[in-house]
From Swiss-Prot:
Keywords: Cell outer membrane, Membrane, Signal, Transmembrane, Transmembrane beta strand. Implicated in a number of adherence functions. OPA proteins are implicated in pathogenesis and are subject to phase variation. The keyword Membrane applies. Coiled coil: none annotated. This is Opacity protein opA66. One of its GO terms (molecular function) is porin activity. Gene3D superfamilies: 2.40.160.20. Residues 1 form the signal peptide. Belongs to the opacity porin family. One of its GO terms (cellular component) is cell outer membrane. InterPro entries: OM_autotransptr_brl_dom (IPR006315), OMP/PagP_b-brl (IPR011250), Porin_opacity (IPR003394). Residues 88-109, 162-183 are annotated as: Disordered. It comes from Neisseria gonorrhoeae. It comes from the Bacteria.
């Protein structure tokens, strides 16, 4: 049975929709970093994605203030991109011969917020017997993994014009270059966030909860990660 004045331990289960913003500070393509040149495109430097994930919480209601520990695991994001372009470097109008450069870029990237273990303090505003808006703050220990494998290959080749009525001849590549950037990290950091929402008491012990939370996962070496989450769940007080 629950304690008087709405006090007592509780459990809560939520389904959350998260908007995730991931920013990677990879070396710029034109600037050397540790003797290497980055080949990573803007697509993998500034990622915006979303996911749906469950969240569970265990806490104690003090009759106004609530303190809870929560755990969530996010969906893994991964993608790949391939691009190719051909640029003419030289053309002889006298004989039709030309020199071209072919550039290929293959990228494979992933990001996974493996887990978030948080502790929150929330204050409920009792408007009436049913509705209770709330605000709060949250500190969390997060674990993320991310990787990038980007390879840029350039090939120069010569095209010789054939005799009238014949196809031109493409010579074997005579100049090849290849640059690559590989990086893989597993990082754990403490981050801070804010919480807001409203609870609706279905029964004295069962509450329907609609909430929002913003969380900054902290400086993850060369990565910044922020989430905006909207959730719907139920809270049961013992």
């Amino acid at each position: 049975a629950g304690e008087g004045n709405g006090r007592g331990p509780y459990v809560q289960a939520d389904l959350a929709y998260a908007y995730e913003h991931i920013t990677h500070d990879y070396p710029k393509p034109t600037d050397p970093s540790k003797g290497k040149l980055s080949t990573v495109s803007d697509y993998f430097r500034n990622i915006r994605t979303h996911s749906i994930h469950p969240r569970v919480s265990v806490g104690y209601d003090f009759g106004g203030w609530r303190i809870a520990a929560d755990y969530a695991r996010y969906r893994k994001w991964n993608d790949s991109k391939y691009s190719v372009s051909i640029k003419n470097l030289q053309r002889r109008t006298s004989n039709g011969n030309r020199r071209d450069r072919k550039t290929e870029n293959q990228e494979n990237g992933s990001f996974h917020a493996v887990s978030s273990l948080g502790l929150s303090a929330v204050y409920d505003f009792k408007l009436n017997d049913k509705f209770k808006p709330y605000i709060g703050a949250r500190v969390a220990y997060g674990h993320v993994r991310h990787s990038i494998d980007s390879t840029k290959k350039t090939t120069e080749f010569l095209t010789t014009a054939g005799a009238r009525g014949t196809d031109p001849t493409v010579s074997s590549p005579y100049k090849n270059t290849q640059d690559a950037h590989q990086e893989s990290n597993s990082i754990r950091r403490v981050g801070l966030g804010v919480i807001a929402g409203v609870g609706f008491d279905i029964t004295p012990n069962l509450t329907l909860d609609a909430g929002y939370r913003y969380h900054n996962w902290g400086r993850l070496e060369n990565t910044r990660f922020k989430t905006h989450e909207a959730s719907l769940g139920v809270r049961y007080r013992f």
